[in-house]
């Protein structure tokens, strides 16, 4: 009987080891160094440019003649400067969209810039944008659509996989370090890709690149789509998610086009340009909820970002800078403890006592201050530890909450009606492990006007 019981125990332990959730705990999931660095970038830009730009299309069907692609004045440095003015620290170029048209001279197909009149068929737009990004201090990434509406090999999965592998080799080996590699699952229908080999091939060339994928491809993702193209995420946004039966660190990227209706440039579309107010809302509901904001920028048929778009990007960048220029905690506050969380330096952090499951960061002011925004940042190297928190002010002899939440993550911006107080605290009501707080900051939006 003892032997039988022991055997069953061994089998049970073996089965538990095979069951992913049994061995996993939310608090045990940590990001890679690359993910931590990526989350610090906060804002990115993605460029859509191709034959669709010249044909007033959004999704090309793969039938466009390459001769339509002939921009007379491509200025990749201008593209990058426009993105940088908005606060972007990385860019992604759509090297091949669903229509199959290649913005680099691929040796595997004639359907691309090498068959166009642009630069006599000798141009390489991927190289131009990559080099411009690096010149201007931005990181560079590539979008390579799995769906290809032009190439006949697409209807034969093994042949198309070889084609896709080859294009991946070209892009991953020629243009320097890639910060991000976008895989878009749109439109593929019943086509079956060998994604295991695709990722293996990518890692051979780019071991540190981060893979972005939408819902259908979460298994392969280091970064995840938020499920919309509005540039916003839910108020509670967790970096640790379960999409395939196991927990994994998958920070979110919230993408949205600068012109609300389209990703590619279209004539007479200026009216859909997002306002500064809308863009600030996107920022506070993406970056301000622990995600990245990815802005879609569409160069026109000249190969330039339209002037009105450039101005809007500049206005947005200026507006973010002004709204978050004056951290009242750093400028006017005095802490009782936790000074590393109040020093305005995201490179430092305050650690709650080991073993604690609740902690408080408190700040006092000599005179009452008025504020309507609280910014909190976790030190994510050790994981996302805060599970419940409140921002509180001391009023009429007791602490009163002005904001309550659960997830903090990389950055949480809580927005509330203006409040005036001399004592403010961040009450970390529930944590999984001792909290690690990089920053607790207070701002008044009125000061930016």
Map each language-model feature to its residues.
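Bacterial N-terminal signal peptides that target proteins for export
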Residues: 1-9
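Bacterial N-terminal signal peptides
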Residues: 9-17
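Mature catalytic domains of secreted/periplasmic carbohydrate-active enzymes
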Residues: 23-343, 349-357, 362-364, 370, ...
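Exposed low-complexity, polar/acidic, P/S/T/G-rich flexible segments that act as propeptides
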Residues: 371, 434-449
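Short, conserved beta-strand segments of beta-strand-rich sandwich/propeller modules, principally
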Residues: 373, 423-425
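Short beta-strand elements bearing conserved aromatic residues within extracellular beta-rich modules
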Residues: 389-391
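Surface-exposed, short loops/turns at beta-strand junctions within beta-sandwich domains
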Residues: 417-420
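Short beta-strand-plus-loop segments that form exposed binding edges in beta-rich domains
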Residues: 427-433
């Amino acid at each position: 009987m003892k032997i039988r019981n022991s055997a069953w125990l061994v089998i049970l332990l073996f089965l538990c080891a095979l069951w992913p959730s049994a061995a996993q705990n939310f608090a045990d999931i940590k990001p890679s160094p690359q993910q931590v660095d990526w989350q610090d970038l906060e804002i990115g830009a993605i460029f859509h440019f191709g034959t669709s730009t010249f044909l007033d299309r959004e999704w090309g069907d793969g039938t466009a003649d390459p001769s339509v692609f002939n921009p007379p004045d491509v200025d990749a440095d201008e593209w990058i400067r426009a993105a940088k003015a908005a606060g972007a620290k990385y860019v992604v170029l759509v090297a091949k969209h669903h229509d199959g048209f290649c913005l680099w001279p691929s040796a595997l197909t004639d359907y691309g810039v090498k068959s166009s009149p642009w630069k006599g068929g000798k141009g390489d737009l991927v190289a131009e944008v990559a080099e411009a990004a690096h010149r201007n201090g931005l990181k560079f990434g590539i979008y390579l659509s799995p769906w290809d509406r032009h190439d006949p090999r697409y209807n034969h999965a093994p042949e198309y996989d070889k084609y896709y592998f080859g294009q991946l080799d070209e892009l991953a080996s020629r243009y320097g370090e890639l910060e991000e590699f976008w895989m878009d699952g749109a439109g593929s229908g019943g086509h079956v890709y060998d994604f295991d080999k695709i990722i293996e091939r990518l890692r051979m060339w780019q071991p540190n690149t981060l893979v972005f994928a939408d819902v259908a491809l979460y298994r392969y993702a280091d970064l995840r789509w938020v499920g919309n193209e509005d540039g916003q995420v839910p108020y509670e946004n967790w970096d640790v998610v379960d999409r395939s039966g196991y927990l994994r660190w998958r920070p979110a990227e919230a993408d949205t086009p600068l012109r609300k209706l389209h990703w590619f440039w279209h004539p007479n579309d200026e009216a859909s340009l997002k306002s500064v107010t809308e863009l600030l809302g996107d920022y506070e509901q993406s970056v301000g909820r622990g995600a990245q904001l990815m802005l879609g920028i569409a160069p026109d048929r000249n190969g330039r970002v339209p002037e009105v778009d450039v101005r809007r990007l500049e206005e947005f960048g200026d507006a973010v800078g002004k709204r978050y220029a004056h951290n009242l905690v750093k400028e006017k506050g005095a802490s009782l403890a936790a000074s590393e969380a109040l020093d305005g330096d995201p490179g430092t952090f305050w650690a709650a006592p080991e073993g604690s499951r609740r902690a408080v960061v408190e700040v006092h002011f000599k005179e009452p201050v008025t504020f309507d925004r609280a910014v909190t940042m976790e030190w994510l190297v050790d994981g996302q530890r805060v599970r419940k928190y409140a921002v509180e002010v001391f009023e009429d002899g007791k602490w009163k909450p002005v904001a309550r939440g659960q997830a903090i993550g990389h950055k949480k911006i809580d927005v509330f009606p203006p409040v005036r107080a001399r004592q403010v605290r961040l009450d970390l009501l529930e944590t999984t492990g001792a909290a690690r707080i990089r920053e607790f900051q207070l701002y008044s939006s009125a000061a930016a006007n």
